[in-house]
Amino acid sequence: MTDRRPEFQTAQFEKGLKIRREVLGDAYVDRSIAAADDVSAPLQKLLTEWCWGEIWSRPGLERKMRSVLNLGMIMALNRSAEFKLHVRGALNNGLTREEIVEIILQGAIYCGAPTSLDAMRTAQAVFAEIDGETETP
């Protein structure tokens, strides 16, 4: 995928891309990178190199803890699309559904009812999607 844009040809981009794929999954990352155009490519480069290649690769916090932090912060910001993405990432990083529900309940006290209701609905939708993916016909 990265051979499409020359600005994506850096070691830092590849480092970030690997972590991003491990957390968010190939399908999501492939869509994001493929959709990068002249307007959005600089943001994709920044996020992949610095968010994923620099911050997510730092020592000191394991990925599971980073996911806990992200869920809390994204919930507080009331960003449903990003919350949905990071619920999947949190599951990929080893959080259980029960832990995700507890994060939402903890956040309800500090972020308020509307935010927590939205976060819970979002988490439920992700759980249902995953359950649908694993069902056998």
Which residues does each PLM region occupy?
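C-terminal structural segments of small proteins and small subunits
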Residues: 111-116
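Residues at alpha-helix boundaries and the short loops/turns that link adjacent helices
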Residues: 23-26, 80, 94, 110
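Short basic/hydrophobic patches in alpha-helices and adjacent helix-turn junctions
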Residues: 89-93, 106-109, 125
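Acidic, glycine/proline-rich low-complexity segments that act as flexible tails and inter-domain linkers
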Residues: 1-64, 92, 118-137
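Residue-level detector of well-ordered alpha-helical segments, enriched
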Residues: 43, 64-68, 82, 99-103, ...
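Short alpha-helical scaffolding segments that buttress acidic/His motifs in well-ordered protein cores
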Residues: 47-51, 68-75, 103-108
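Mid-chain, well-packed structural core segment of small domains
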Residues: 71, 75-101
